[in-house]
């Protein structure tokens, strides 16, 4: 079912592309609306609504299936088919060259179904959507001699007058896509349509704009204003000698690096005190052999 819906969506987009290439005139739209009103009042009576367009009133020179149809299943209406056009145009649409006016069984009426497969009642708009079932999945709809292959249009919600809001700045749609690609293909156009609609209305925008600060410049990074704590740190050295362990403890300035070995480090900042409370009670501070770097330690 998803594949069939994708096929109908594609056919609809192709028809919209043809309409955007050469839009229908206002006179033809008024006639279609009048015919639709008559059909809605008398659903059992079939009325022919297609007429030959005058030169310049409509740019569609090839037939395009009308989206207006009776729920009783009438003949498909062809708009813009002149007296000189034959059934070759039907082959362009993917329809076999036969009498289109007599192929009433080629129309298929779609309803809305729930997850259990039952038809949902009370929805009137879905009953009037008539789709030509004889269209091939790879067929294209022509929109004139100078049709645009890479153009597309989104139809928005109809206004109170019955006319649809169109978006002529949409991105092109790929010719062949699967059912899983419908959401991806239409995502950019939906966002563009929402952006245009939100810009055109007078209602305040909901939410707030997210302002992302720029990344920090490493060249302008400032040092911390908090000074490094000055003082001494206590270091411990364990030496194994056979079955004995010698433990040595001493202090080094806080600003010096921690290294291996019994090393008496020197203050690099010039602010660390010479002795602390622990240094004063250290009896071996004067008799201990100090090394100021690793190469001085004998192996």
Curated annotation (Swiss-Prot):
Function of the protein: Plays an essential role in the inhibition of host immune response. Prevents the establishment of cellular antiviral state by blocking interferon-alpha/beta (IFN-alpha/beta) production and signaling pathway. Interacts with host IFIH1/MDA5 and DHX58/LGP2 to inhibit the transduction pathway involved in the activation of IFN-beta promoter, thus protecting the virus against cell antiviral state. Blocks the type I interferon signaling pathway by interacting with host TYK2 and thereby inhibiting downstream STAT1 and STAT2 phosphorylation.
Quaternary structure, from the entry: Interacts with host IFIH1/MDA5 and DHX58/LGP2; these interactions are involved in the inhibition of the host type I interferon signaling pathway. Interacts with host TYK2; this interaction inhibits the type I interferon signaling pathway without affecting the type II pathway. Interacts with host IRF7; this interaction inhibits IRF7 translocation to the nucleus. Interacts with host CHUK. Interacts with host RELA/p65; this interaction inhibits the nuclear translocation of NF-KappaB.
Keyword Metal-binding: yes
Region of interest: Disordered: 41-99, 134-168
Chain positions recorded as Zn(2+) 2 binding sites: 255, 267, 269, 272
BP GO annotations: symbiont-mediated suppression of host cytoplasmic pattern recognition receptor signaling pathway via inhibition of IRF7 activity; symbiont-mediated suppression of host cytoplasmic pattern recognition receptor signaling pathway via inhibition of MDA-5 activity; symbiont-mediated suppression of host cytoplasmic pattern recognition receptor signaling pathway via inhibition of RIG-I activity; symbiont-mediated suppression of host JAK-STAT cascade via inhibition of host TYK2 activity; symbiont-mediated suppression of host JAK-STAT cascade via inhibition of STAT1 activity; symbiont-mediated suppression of host JAK-STAT cascade via inhibition of STAT2 activity; symbiont-mediated suppression of host type I interferon-mediated signaling pathway
Keyword Zinc assigned: yes
Superkingdom in the source lineage: Viruses
UniProt family annotation: Belongs to the paramyxoviruses V protein family.
GO molecular function, one term: metal ion binding
Annotated spans, Interaction with host STAT1: 110-120
Keywords tagged on the record: Host cytoplasm, Host-virus interaction, Inhibition of host innate immune response by virus, Inhibition of host interferon signaling pathway by virus, Inhibition of host IRF7 by virus, Inhibition of host MDA5 by virus, Inhibition of host RLR pathway by virus, Inhibition of host STAT1 by virus, Inhibition of host STAT2 by virus, Inhibition of host TYK2 by virus, Interferon antiviral system evasion, Metal-binding, Viral immunoevasion, Zinc
Name this protein carries in UniProt: Non-structural protein V
Record's compositionally biased regions (Low complexity): 134-145
Entry's localization field: Host cytoplasm
Any one of the GO CC terms: host cell cytoplasm
Main location: host cell
InterPro entries from the UniProt entry: Paramyx_V_Zn-bd, Paramyxo_P/V_N
Organism of this sequence: Measles virus (strain Edmonston)
Domain notes: The N-terminus interacts with host JAK1 and STAT1. The C-terminus interacts with host STAT2. The C-terminus also interacts with host PP1.
Binding-site residues, Zn(2+) 1: 232, 251, 276, 279
Regions of compositional bias (Acidic residues) in chain numbering: 146-160
Site (Interaction with host STAT2) location in chain: 240, 246, 248, 250
Gene name tied to this protein: P/V
């Amino acid at each position: 079912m998803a594949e069939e819906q994708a096929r109908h969506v594609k056919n609809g987009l192709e028809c919209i592309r043809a309409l955007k290439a050469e839009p229908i005139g206002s006179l033809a739209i008024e006639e279609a609306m009048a015919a639709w009103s008559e059909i809605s009042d008398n659903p059992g009576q079939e009325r022919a609504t297609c007429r030959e367009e005058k030169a310049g009133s409509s740019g569609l020179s090839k037939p395009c299936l009308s989206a207006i149809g009776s729920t009783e299943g009438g003949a498909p209406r062809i708009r813009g088919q002149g007296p000189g056009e034959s059934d070759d145009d039907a082959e362009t649409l993917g329809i076999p060259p036969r009498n289109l006016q007599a192929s009433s069984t080629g129309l298929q009426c779609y309803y809305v179904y729930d997850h259990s497969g039952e038809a949902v009642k009370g929805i009137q708009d879905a009953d009037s959507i008539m789709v030509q079932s004889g269209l091939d999945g790879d067929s294209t709809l022509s929109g004139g001699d100078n049709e645009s292959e890479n153009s597309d249009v989104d139809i928005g919600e109809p206004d109170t007058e019955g006319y649809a809001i169109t978006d002529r700045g949409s991105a092109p749609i790929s010719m062949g896509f699967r059912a899983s690609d419908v959401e991806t293909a239409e995502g950019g156009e939906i966002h563009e349509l929402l952006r245009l609609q939100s810009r055109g209305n007078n209602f305040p925008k909901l939410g707030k704009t997210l302002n992302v600060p720029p990344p920090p410049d490493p060249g302008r990074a400032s040092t911390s204003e908090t000074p490094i704590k000055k003082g001494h740190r206590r270091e411990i050295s364990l030496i194994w000698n056979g079955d004995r362990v010698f433990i040595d403890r001493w202090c080094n300035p806080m600003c010096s690096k921690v290294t291996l070995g019994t090393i008496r480090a020197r203050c690099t900042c010039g602010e660390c005190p010479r002795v602390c409370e622990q240094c004063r009670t250290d009896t071996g501070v004067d008799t201990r052999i100090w090394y100021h770097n690793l190469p001085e330690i004998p192996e």
